[in-house]
Design a protein with these regions (language model features):
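Bacterial extracytoplasmic/cell-wall-associated proteins, especially those involved in peptidoglycan
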Residues: 1-127
């Protein structure tokens, strides 16, 4: 992986699960990596993260390259590093490619199979 891969993965964790527990952060990281390993998605982490309409924060271009600060960023960065260097995974999410916050109901969710809920996110696989 590159420094840019690490930065993009950490940014995704931070914006999608920055206030979640470590397990919630790891889960978002795993979805990102699962997508990277799927032929349905781009072939590098930054392209997966910035793929149009995939992660809501990434639709705001002003957030793409700013470097966050604070304990949630530090935790997100540490988890991204653990995932990329050690392959840390969340049990039960190996086939999951989708999730959403529990306070929204996206149209695509009815076409998926829920796998688990971690923190405020519901994780899915395809039917």
């Amino acid at each position: 992986y590159t420094d840019l891969d690490l930065f993009c993965l950490a940014k995704n964790i931070f914006h999608e699960a920055g206030i979640e527990s470590d397990i919630g952060k790891y889960a978002v990281a795993q979805i990102t990596i699962n997508r990277l390993q799927s032929p349905r998605y781009p072939d590098n982490i930054c392209s997966v993260v910035l793929d149009r309409y995939q992660f809501s924060w990434a639709n705001q271009r002003s957030k793409h390259w700013t470097r966050p600060k604070g304990p949630n960023w530090d935790a997100s960065y540490r988890i991204a590093l653990n995932v990329l260097e050690d392959g840390d995974r969340v049990v039960g999410l190996d086939n999951a490619h989708y999730y959403h916050a529990d306070y929204v109901n996206p149209h695509w969710a009815s076409q998926m199979t829920p796998v688990t809920t971690i923190g405020r996110h519901i994780f899915y696989t395809r039917h």
